């Protein structure tokens, strides 16, 4: 499809608008520690048990509550793109504090300290 002579705003919207089963979000990292979770840092909101030796091996996502209202619910399988090394298949097993909007968190090992990505595409595949 060629979009010649279209307004720049239309082309930008066409290229970046999410489909019905996807959303564009901001993504950050979190660790399985009480400071970043609740007191039971080895269980997610869905009661999935986290391996304390290697929490990042599960590929677990936490989603903001507004995304849950859009169908990104606990137990969903999603594809992440536009997040560099975090791209791929992830499992929604946790939810974020209600103060966050349009945001996801990747559960990672404590060796990975920082990470933030903008315009990340989250696409529901199940």
Regions picked out by a protein language model, each given a short descriptive name:
Residues 5, 10-126:
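Solvent-exposed, well-ordered loop and adjacent helix/strand elements within mature globular domains
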């Amino acid at each position: 499809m060629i979009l010649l002579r279209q307004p720049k705003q239309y082309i930008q919207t066409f290229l970046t608008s999410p489909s019905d089963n996807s959303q564009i979000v901001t993504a950050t990292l979190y660790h399985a520690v009480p400071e970043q979770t609740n007191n039971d840092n080895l269980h997610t909101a869905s009661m999935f048990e986290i391996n304390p030796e290697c929490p990042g091996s599960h590929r677990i996502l936490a989603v903001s509550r507004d995304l849950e209202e859009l169908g990104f619910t606990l137990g969903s399988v999603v594809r992440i793109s536009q997040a560099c090394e975090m791209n791929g298949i992830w499992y929604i097993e946790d939810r974020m504090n209600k103060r966050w909007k349009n945001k996801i968190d990747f559960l990672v090992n404590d060796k990975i300290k920082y990470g933030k990505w903008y315009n990340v595409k989250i696409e529901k595949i199940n």
